[in-house]
Amino acid sequence: MRRILAFFAVLATSAAMASAADGRWRPSPADGFDWQYVAPFDFSRPTSTLNLDAFDADPALIADLRRRGVKPICYVNVGAWEDWRPDRRQFPAAVMGKAYVGWEGERWLDVRRIDLLLPIMRARFRLCRDKGFLAVEPDNIDGFENETGFPISRAEQLRFNRAIAEAAHDLGLSIALKNAPELAAELADVYDFAIAEDCFKWDWCDMLQPFARQNKAVVAIEYPEDGRDPLKHCAEAAALSIQIVVKRRELDSWSRRCR
């Protein structure tokens, strides 16, 4: 047991030393998380981090958050095209896949075409950095498990996910593994923290333990739909070193969390 504890202590120390060496901020397991993408907003509520949309966020707001010690995290959709984004015409027809069922105006992207997609994603990450964000939350990095219109393999998805992590790190940004639990074991050494949607609802939170074992932050966004109370999982979350944040799916200012 002592050897095991010593091993994890070394991992935590190594992570802290790496952060100091590269100058990149990383959220810790103790940091509080929040997301606000749509009105009503409340930016006065205490939180350690705040996730905002890359294109919609005002640089003045980000600067104010940072003055108050809040670490801003930048939402970027890297795996699906959105028809309302200002850079939507930069995506060539060759990467446009099937409609993303349930999300109007979105289509899956062919992440096998790193040569075509990575320059666009680098530009988006650069926008995040220039606005003052400290990390990125890349969405839809699990296309290989979905009906995208392309025969994306697990290996090809991993290759894309590693490429965008490198792109973020090159700009001094931390990056979250969002969902994609089947890839967590292979990407925990590359990604800086993990975000999971409804992992307690669907019973896969334990698959993110490769992050927790490295003392990296793991946060579960749980949506209280169908009368479900996600806070009943607080004890289980604590045992897994996972923070629960309960949000409405539209991600306005409303939230609940474990005490």
State what each model feature region is.
Residues 1-4:
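Positively charged n-region of N-terminal signal peptides that target proteins for export
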Residues 6-15:
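Bacterial N-terminal signal peptides
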Residues 16-20:
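Sec/Tat signal peptide C-region and signal peptidase I cleavage site
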Residues 21-259:
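Glycan-processing catalytic domains of CAZymes
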